[in-house]
């Protein structure tokens, strides 16, 4: 019996009109759809009057679900893999299924379409010839700062996903490690009614979040300029000055002095002082 195929189908990230004709035809024709959340996928399918057999495939059951789906394909059935929004396996479930399909010599067919990180990058005005997608940063501040220090000197454009609950704390740590001068682009609610895309520097971006100019709603794609020789000047100055003040036993005045000289937010400077004291 000839194997079926695995179709990796991108779905809208907000606007249903972004669904391609080819995607709709594939979803209508396949024998089975593997969905991250069958309830959300059913909403998409019902909008386009598509009736299909579905199976759930998410991060907690992917290994077991992949075995069942490979068996279906080996029996000649074609399967479409979809995520809740965007392109499957890009920071979403699907990798294990796709890997097993390749190992079993099953044809894997990509159906291009919406992808939040690529959509944001394309309009960011930042270099896209070399970029690094880091997904979500670690939840805990110490681990987050450790990861950011690894990326501090990376010259590539950096792309992060940040949840609404961690946007302020994540930006504070990013400023602490990268400084406030780097160009940054943030995209929120892309393709939806309240879509918001803003290009500024990291320092201004945090201010806009804190005063509510950028609402803490939805999921954020943050794109940050890669390291350049001159884009961390204020941070280098702040660290050097802070180090001198600490060495001269002026810690009690250091935060106020460095904040005044560099114009970097006080809480960022305070965190910097704590970091430098740990290193001594």
Question: Model segments located where?
Answer:
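Glycine-rich, flexible N-terminal cofactor/catalytic loop recognition
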Residues: 1-60
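A contiguous loop/helix-start segment that scaffolds small-molecule binding in enzyme catalytic cores
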Residues: 3, 157, 164-280
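Loop/turn-to-beta-strand initiation segments
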Residues: 5-6, 76-80, 156-157
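Short active-site oxyanion
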Residues: 27-33, 106-109, 157-158
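General beta-strand structural signal in soluble alpha/beta enzymes
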Residues: 35, 110-113, 160, 186
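Conserved helicase motor
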Residues: 57-63, 137-140
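Glycine/small-residue-rich loop that forms an oxyanion/phosphate-binding "nest" at active or ligand-binding sites
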Residues: 66-115, 119
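Class I SAM-dependent methyltransferase SAM-binding "motif I" and its flanking Rossmann-like core
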Residues: 96-154
């Amino acid at each position: 019996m000839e194997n079926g195929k695995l179709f990796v189908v991108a779905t809208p990230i907000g606007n249903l009109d972004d669904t391609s004709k080819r995607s709709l035809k594939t979803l209508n024709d396949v024998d089975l759809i593997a969905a991250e959340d069958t309830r959300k996928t059913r909403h998409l399918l019902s909008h386009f009057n598509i009736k299909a057999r579905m199976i759930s495939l998410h991060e907690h059951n992917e290994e077991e679900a992949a075995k069942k789906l490979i068996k279906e394909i080996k029996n000649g059935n074609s399967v479409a893999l979809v995520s809740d929004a965007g392109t499957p396996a890009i920071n979403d479930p699907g990798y294990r299924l796709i890997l097993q399909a390749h190992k079993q010599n099953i044809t894997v067919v990509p159906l291009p379409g919406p992808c939040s990180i690529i959509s944001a990058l394309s309009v960011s005005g930042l270099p896209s010839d070399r970029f690094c997608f880091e997904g979500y940063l670690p939840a805990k501040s110490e681990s987050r700062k450790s990861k950011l220090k690894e990326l501090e000197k990376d010259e590539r454009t950096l792309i992060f996903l940040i949840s609404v609950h961690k946007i302020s704390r994540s930006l504070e740590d990013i400023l602490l490690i990268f400084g406030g001068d780097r160009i940054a682009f943030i995209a929120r609610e892309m393709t939806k009614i309240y879509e918001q895309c803003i290009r500024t520097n990291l320092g201004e971006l945090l201010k806009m979040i804190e005063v509510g100019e950028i609402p803490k709603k939805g999921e954020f794609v943050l794109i940050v300029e890669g390291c350049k020789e001159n884009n961390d000047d204020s941070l280098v100055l702040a660290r050097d000055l802070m180090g001198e003040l600490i060495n001269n036993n002026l810690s009690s005045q250091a935060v106020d002095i460095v904040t005044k000289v560099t114009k970097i937010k006080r809480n960022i400077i305070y965190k910097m002082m704590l970091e430098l004291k740990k290193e001594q």
